[in-house]
């Protein structure tokens, strides 16, 4: 039988598929899941650019890449190139998406019962705001350059 001192030092057992486990899972993986989603969107845009040659699909591909890597136009890509610019854009954008995923996880963890479905709703709201900002910035840039 355990003594009272031994009971205090033992870690509480967590039910593998319980409420605490889900909240812990959201806290640990929310940011990385958001980065993964952004990477998939970026790779989709790159595939569209690589597989098509029309102006319409080129615009769709560039918008998809810019949504996945929102710092891309901010560092001057694709007008100016260079490994440093690509590194800054990719690492900075990954940090932004990680932060958005962690923010979504933190807000969802406040609920009594948190799930990935709740995280995706919260993340969708923040991701939509970020994507709309990117699209509006690209529209302003295209208008100022005379492309629209």
Identify the meaning behind each predicted range:
Residues 19-85:
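Membrane-associated alpha-helix detector
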Residues 27-36, 119-129:
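Alpha-helical membrane-anchoring segments
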Residues 68-108:
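Short alpha-helical packing/oligomerization segments
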Residues 133-148:
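Juxtamembrane boundary at the C-terminal end of a transmembrane helix
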Residues 1-36, 145-148:
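Actinobacteria-biased recognition of intrinsically disordered, low-complexity terminal regions
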Residues 35-39, 86, 90-98, 126-134:
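Alpha-helical transmembrane spans of integral membrane proteins, capturing the lipid-embedded, hydrophobic core
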Residues 32, 56, 98, 136-138:
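Extracytoplasmic/cell-surface-exposed regions of Actinobacterial cell-envelope-associated
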Residues 20-27, 95-123:
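Cytoplasmic membrane-interface segments at the C-terminal ends of transmembrane helices
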């Amino acid at each position: 039988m355990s003594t009272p001192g031994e009971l205090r030092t033992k870690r509480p057992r967590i039910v593998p598929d319980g409420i605490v486990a889900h909240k812990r899972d959201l806290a640990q993986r929310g940011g990385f899941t958001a980065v993964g989603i952004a990477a998939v969107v970026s790779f989709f845009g790159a595939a569209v650019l690589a597989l098509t040659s029309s102006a319409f699909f080129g615009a769709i591909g560039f918008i998809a890449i810019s949504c996945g890597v929102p710092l891309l136009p901010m560092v001057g890509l694709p007008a100016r190139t260079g490994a440093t610019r690509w590194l800054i854009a990719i690492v900075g954008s990954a940090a932004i998406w990680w932060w958005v995923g962690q923010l979504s996880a933190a807000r969802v963890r406040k609920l009594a019962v948190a799930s990935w479905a709740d995280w995706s709703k919260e993340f969708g709201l923040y991701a939509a705001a970020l994507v709309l900002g990117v699209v509006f910035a690209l529209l302003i840039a295209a208008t100022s350059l005379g492309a629209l």
